[in-house]
Amino acid sequence: MNIGRAIKVTQAVVDIKFEGELPKIFNALKSKLKYKDKELVLEVSQHIGDNIVRCIAMDSTDGMSRGDEFVDTGAPISVPIGRSTLGRIFNVVGELIDECGPLKGKYNLEPIHRAPPSFTEQRIQEEVLVTGIKVIDLLAPYLKGGKIGLFGGAGVGKTVLIMELINNIAKAHKGFSVFAGVGERTREGNDLYHEMITSNVININEHEKSQAVLVYGQMNEPPGARARVALTALTMAEYFRDRENQDVLFFVDNIFRFTQAGSEISALLGRIPSAVGYQPTLATDMGAMQERIASTTSGSITSVQAIYVPADDLTDPAPATTFSHLDATTVLSRQIAEMGIYPAVDPLDSTSQSLSAEIIGEEHYKVASEVKRILQTYKSLQDIIAILGMDELSDEDKIIVDRARKIQKFLSQPFHVAEIFTGMPGKFVSLSDTVSSFKGIVEGKYDHLPEAAFYMVGNIDEAIKKAELIQAEAK
């Protein structure tokens, strides 16, 4: 047994001195004493000479003192994998935190640090993943096995959108979902758990019938837990992809907190910061995780990642580094949220590699392109409208502005997960309905309907009914 002693404790970073063999980088060390009735797990991060290793703590170091003994486990942090993990909530080191008793059934322990799949193992799918959300399905469609980023500042609706995607995709999707709560609010994690129980995605009486695993390292946790919890969840998702040959959904809320935790640790480890105070290894840390989220010949992982944008600045190094790894980006805009249009997705800033006629079909591509053209023209006319008013526009431009405003309103949609706040029943709109509805708007079939009829409805039939109600009330 290789035992070391703590010689220095600095918040989440602990220096341990070993007399014998030094533990390898990423090895887990476990405390012989218990702090707050729990073993403390450390992860080796640096060898700093004189038989001393510098480690990151996965839990609070409160109550620790110099001289406390730690045992080298001889392996990285290892977490349970297998079907028995379904329906349960884990923390970063694979301990259950849902108070539903011990893990039942067979499971193996797997290290959280692994190499990504090789080039020969990877494959690309060109099948669109229908979300039931109009603005996404029409203008920035998602691919099965793709990486999707939801970008937005504070309070523009990232978590609500990710919860609606879980609701729409995980319910319709018969495979398994893994959710990683990285440095977000505990209340939201609790809400999501109960929402999953209500919708039968999680069965608390018979866990083996559940379809989801939850892994939480919330914002009150030390940076070590927040920096590693995404890897813990990813390890569990990889099991379903590689051993069960499943198409897995992997949700992360919020990937920025992963970067932020890395930045906190980097400063405590004494590294010189790079741009805007981020860790010098930002691109490497992000790449090591993102490269593991891949589709292989065994199965696929479709990931949806919420990405907080500090001060609404998309050029900040944290969101900018994430951009390069994604297949589709859904950008949430404060200006659109202020107009009362939810989801507050920016139709011109959001992008998708799958927006091509070969993947989505000729009709869908033409409609999406025309919608973007109308919105872009309206955007360029806004200065003229603000200074001179609508009367100074040509007749053709007036028609474009009218259609653009209807499109803007029609891109809003009531969500199932927001029913309790809005009082409106949620709507799931099929892809064919979305394309045909917008095709009618851009062709001018609905120019006679009032603008208000397009706000917060599902398909175009609902807009027509709403227009009839508005006209009846006007009489």
From Swiss-Prot:
Which keywords does UniProt give here?
A: ATP synthesis, ATP-binding, Cell inner membrane, Cell membrane, CF(1), Hydrogen ion transport, Ion transport, Membrane, Nucleotide-binding, Translocase, Transport
Query: One matching Pfam family, short form?
Result: ATP-synt_ab
Q: Which reaction does it catalyse?
A: ATP + H2O + 4 H(+)(in) = ADP + phosphate + 5 H(+)(out)
Instruction: Give binding positions for ATP.
Output: 152-159
| InterPro entries per UniProt | AAA+_ATPase, ATP-synt_VA_C, ATP_synth_F1_bsu, ATPase_a/bsu_AS, ATPase_alpha/beta_chains, ATPase_F1/V1/A1_a/bsu_N, ATPase_F1/V1/A1_a/bsu_N_sf, ATPase_F1/V1/A1_a/bsu_nucl-bd
Q: Where found in the cell?
A: Cell inner membrane
* Enzyme Commission identifier(s): 7.1.2.2
> Single GO cellular component annotation?
plasma membrane
Q: Which GO terms describe its molecular function?
A: ATP binding; ATP hydrolysis activity; proton-transporting ATP synthase activity, rotational mechanism
Record membrane topology = Peripheral membrane protein
Query: What function is annotated for this protein?
Result: Produces ATP from ADP in the presence of a proton gradient across the membrane. The catalytic sites are hosted primarily by the beta subunits.
Fill in the subunit field for this protein. Answer: F-type ATPases have 2 components, CF(1) - the catalytic core - and CF(0) - the membrane proton channel. CF(1) has five subunits: alpha(3), beta(3), gamma(1), delta(1), epsilon(1). CF(0) has three main subunits: a(1), b(2) and c(9-12). The alpha and beta chains form an alternating ring which encloses part of the gamma chain. CF(1) is attached to CF(0) by a central stalk formed by the gamma and epsilon chains, while a peripheral stalk is formed by the delta and b chains.
Assigned protein family: Belongs to the ATPase alpha/beta chains family.
Name of the protein: ATP synthase subunit beta
Q: Give the encoding gene's name.
A: atpD
